[in-house]
């Protein structure tokens, strides 16, 4: 439940200050004399009490208008007000990956000076200066490569990716727990709103690549139970579920989703886990949008119409995502925003992509997914997480309204997340069981080839030597 805090108090004062002089007279001046005037006074006082109670108990219901005393051209003041009353939620940040690779999981190491400052894009001060209200922390593991050829390993070859994914989740949870005054771990959309109301940064987990789940829907379910709430269907490699954009960029065929990928989409819908289409090929995007029973997300992508980067979404996909109720969250990666001249990328390129998506898909379907700490270089003007307010100000300069900014900042992704949860509830109420499909290319080792013991029609095939010596 939302707590009473300065956000709610500020909004209440705004309501009081914005009432007309005549209405204040009714509410604040107890009329004397006739019963009618006394009833009017009581009615006015009761009405104001209801308004104030609703504001203080749920600050998210009171953010539809800016205070009347803010100059519409004072973009900094408008931004501060909006981000104080609506959570700014980034769809993708790789700080846990840096902790794993640079500190070998050791968040208690003295070198991890998160409180006093890091050279990376993210630390305590930068998050607070950037008015961040929620963050999807990425559990990212590289696509497995052959150590000699640097080529993708065969899909049925056992790798370390699932183990490392579990370690990455462990890092994220311990990191969040280490700073309880700053972060609150959440696994549902309601908690994300509660965290913001409590003055904390809601912290959520997304897995950046279904190659990390061991080709197994059973593993998928366990990762959900550990708190992961989205999975990027592919990273920079094909997997058993679908084609990656990187494959098409290298001249490979765009085969879209596999048959097993269709089972994966269905199970993600049943679980209430968001399907992330960043990194996937265009046909994988289209196949998923056709099959999914819930909205989808692009946690960190861009508009293909502005930059011919094959991992960006073309306009037909932007429109289909909107029709499905989903969201496209814009990334800050230079080489994708400006493939012709990455060093020239600036904050204005990001604004261009946001604006294009808003015009094609609508303001209900656009958000931000930076990929901070997952890319070595970011656009000028977006050097770290402290720069989000400036991004919002530039959108306002282009003409974005306060309501549109609130949607972009966090309301859209929270709506999508909530709708994915509701779709899962509906599917489960219908009685759909966990999907037991198994990838056709799975290799069964000898120890997994069970002897015929359970069933009468097969017991005659029992081979005593196979069972081993007593």
Swiss-Prot record:
InterPro entries: Metal_Hydrolase, Pept_M19. It is found in: Membrane. It comes from the Eukaryota. Gene3D superfamilies: Metal-dependent hydrolases. The keyword Metal-binding applies. Keywords: Dipeptidase, Disulfide bond, Glycoprotein, Hydrolase, Membrane, Metal-binding, Metalloprotease, Protease, Transmembrane, Transmembrane helix, Zinc. This is Putative dipeptidase TSTA_079200. It comes from Talaromyces stipitatus (strain ATCC 10500 / CBS 375.48 / QM 6759 / NRRL 1006).
């Amino acid at each position: 439940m939302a707590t009473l805090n300065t956000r709610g108090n500020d909004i209440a004062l705004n309501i009081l200050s914005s009432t007309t002089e005549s209405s204040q007279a009714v509410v604040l001046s107890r009329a004397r004399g006739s019963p009618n005037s006394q009833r009017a006074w009581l009615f006015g006082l009761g009405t104001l009490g209801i308004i104030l109670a609703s504001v203080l108990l749920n600050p998210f219901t009171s953010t539809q208008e800016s205070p009347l005393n803010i100059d519409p051209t004072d973009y900094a003041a408008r931004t501060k007000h909006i981000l104080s009353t609506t959570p700014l939620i980034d769809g993708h940040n790789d700080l846990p990956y840096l902790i794993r690779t640079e500190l070998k999981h050791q968040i208690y190491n003295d070198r991890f000076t998160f409180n006093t400052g890091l050279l990376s894009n993210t630390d305590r001060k930068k998050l607070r200066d950037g008015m961040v209200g929620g963050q999807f922390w990425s559990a990212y593991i590289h696509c497995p490569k052959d150590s000699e050829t640097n080529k993708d390993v065969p899909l049925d070859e056992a790798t370390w990716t699932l183990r490392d994914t579990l370690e990455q989740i462990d890092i994220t949870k311990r990191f969040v727990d280490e700073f309880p005054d700053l972060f609150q771990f959440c696994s549902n959309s309601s908690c994300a709103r509660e965290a913001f109301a409590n003055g904390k940064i809601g912290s959520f987990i997304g897995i950046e690549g279904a190659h990390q789940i061991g080709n197994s829907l059973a593993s998928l379910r366990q990762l959900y139970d550990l708190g992961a709430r989205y999975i990027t269907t592919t990273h920079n490699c094909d997997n058993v579920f679908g084609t990656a954009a990187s494959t098409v960029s290298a001249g490979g065929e765009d085969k879209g989703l596999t048959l097993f990928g269709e089972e994966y989409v269905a199970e993600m819908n049943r679980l209430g886990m968001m399907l992330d289409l960043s990194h996937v090929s265009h046909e994988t995007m289209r196949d998923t949008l056709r099959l999914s029973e819930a909205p989808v997300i692009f946690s960190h992508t861009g508009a293909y119409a502005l930059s011919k980067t094959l991992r960006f979404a073309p306009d037909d996909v932007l429109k289909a995502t909107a029709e499905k109720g989903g969201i496209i969250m814009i990334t800050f990666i230079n080489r994708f925003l400006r493939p012709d001249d990455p060093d020239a990328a600036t904050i204005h390129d990001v604004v261009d992509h946001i604006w294009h998506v808003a015009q094609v898909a609508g303001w209900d379907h656009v958000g931000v997914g930076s990929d901070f700490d997952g890319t070595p270089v970011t656009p000028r003007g977006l050097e770290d997480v402290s720069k989000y307010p400036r991004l919002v100000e530039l959108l306002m300069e282009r003409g974005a309204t306060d309501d549109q900014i609130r949607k972009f900042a966090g309301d859209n992704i929270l709506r999508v997340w909530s709708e994915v949860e509701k779709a899962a509830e509906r599917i489960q109420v219908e009685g759909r069981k966990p999907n037991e499909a198994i990838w056709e290319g799975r290799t069964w080792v000898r120890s997994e080839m069970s002897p015929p013991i359970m069933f009468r029609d097969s017991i005659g095939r029992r081979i005593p030597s196979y069972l081993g010596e007593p």
